[in-house]
Amino acid sequence: GTNTDFDGNFSIQDASSGDVLVFSYLGYKTQEITIGDASAFDVFLVEDAEALDEVIVLGYVSQKAANISGSVSTVSEEQVQSLKPVRMEDALQGLPGVNMFSNGAPGAKPTVIIRGVTSYTGNAPLVIVDGITLSLDDMNALDPSDIESISVLKDASTTALYGVRGGNGVIVITTKSGNRNQDAKFSFNTSYGQQSPEKTIGVLNATEYAAILNEMSVSSGGALIYPDISNLGKGTDWQKEIFRIDAPLVSHSISASGGSEKTSYYVSAGFTGQEGLIYGKDKQFFNRSTFRANFNTDLSSKLKLIVNNRFSNLKDSGLGDIIFNALNMSPTTPVFADDGSYAISNTITQEIKNPMAQISNSYGEGNTNTISGKIELQYDLLKDLKVNSRLGYTYVNIHGKGFTPYQFYGVGHNATNANSDLSPISNTDADGNVTQTWNSVSENKDHHFSYTYDLNASYKFSMDQHNFNVFAGFQIGKNSGGSVSGSKVGVPFNSWDYADLSSATGPDDEQRSGSWQYVSRRVSLMARAEYDYNEKYLASFTIRRDGSTSFGQNNKFGYFP
């Protein structure tokens, strides 16, 4: 996506005839133009009266679109459902001012940049889900079927209320809730698709590759490496060998919603499964299972209780630099040698691997459980004075395991840890001490817990055509967590089935272990005042004071207007 400049001019790269340009702006009707032979367009957007009256969720506050003075982009429930993204960030693709980059692996976390490169220590935006502060990592645990709306806050006017943590932009997500006075409504959605590479990278074939190596060798005074290149042909297309054209992507979700005069509910469960584009479906996949229960009820005519809870389980497995090796492996090398083992290159001996052998030798898995939710009380103290008290929490438990088997990529190769028959390599030093190579298994268990407590109040009032909306709040929070990890050698039968710390039988002096833990606390005060005159002239003023144990010793507090 792109933005216009101050005068409304814009340019976009890599657009081809037949592509569709989508022009949108908050409060205006979206317009689509199909690219033909023209290279310049005059685009006029028409005001959308309904869109101007739409209420946009900005996190702590909500405003009519017509009264927002800052920069905000929105994604509706209908847009999310039509896109059917695996990760919620994918639904932001193409929004003005939002740049995204991903490596394409199943469930992979993309890089999302909203306000450009703003920090040496990271540019990930802050994520708010139903008022709960999360990070970009947590978006992987959300089921797109549960999403009601997404707002992306992009400038200082809209993000200042979040202080220093909003400096990279803020993504505000609201999940679905049931409607009151509605009978139970059940919904089931399922989808199936297949993924394939859109294009591959052009590389040398075997004949071209051999000719260049011959020229290089002769120019340095050596002999021809390939005396007869006429019989080589195109050789091995390694990208064709590693990529699939039918990688499945499935999604299922079921929900129930409804409510009575004073109560509403929304309950859902979902599953998403994605296999990678690289062969070996058990080596590269992403599976997500979710359960959500949102509930709100009137405890009295002035007091409302809201309870949201969700659980998610993520299972994933990934591969390393397979594509790198496919692009750099010699096309003169076949996939398999004459004896049925994976072939090795005679010209690349230290770093590049046969990518099919690398897939076969790659083992790893991750399992992540997340519980997150909030308990919120909303009290109407006066007609236009509302007080909110909210406790949000998130607990994450992660278990990861990896296995490095005995593997042979050629004598002297950096990754070789076994002989060609996959037996250990033994060495004897001058004193007669014998050492050998080992296969190994590693495991880690991480846990993270965070909570935030918010107490805030908002007051709306008007005097003639002067309209005011005042907000003030207090927040405290804590993040804590830790990890233990270990590795051992000597996995029985050189098998993933026996890759476990308790099963490894190698010597104790080859055993490794480690641990870490962290804790941080923060406290914040914030205030915001919004003013409009007859909904034509707008102004907003925001200030926040943050204190954090993560700040420098002499700067524990700071103001962020």
Residue map of PLM features:
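Periplasm-facing N-terminal accessory domains of Gram-negative outer-membrane beta-barrel systems
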Residues: 1-54
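N-terminal periplasmic "start-of-domain" segments of outer-membrane beta-barrel proteins
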Residues: 1-9, 56-81, 108-111, 125-126, ...
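Short acidic/polar hinge/loop motifs at secondary-structure boundaries
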Residues: 10-14, 79, 84, 130-158
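Residues embedded in well-ordered regular secondary structure
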Residues: 74, 81-85, 94-101, 105-113, ...
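Outer-membrane beta-barrel channels and translocator barrels
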Residues: 85, 249, 260-261, 296, ...
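Non-catalytic regulatory/gating segments with a bias toward low-complexity or hydrophobic composition
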Residues: 92, 131, 150-151, 171-173
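Surface-exposed loop/interface segments of Gram-negative outer-membrane beta-barrel transport/assembly proteins
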Residues: 180-236, 272, 277-372, 390, ...
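Repeated loop/turn-to-beta-strand initiation elements of outer-membrane beta-barrel proteins
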Residues: 262-265, 302-305, 384-387, 465-468, ...
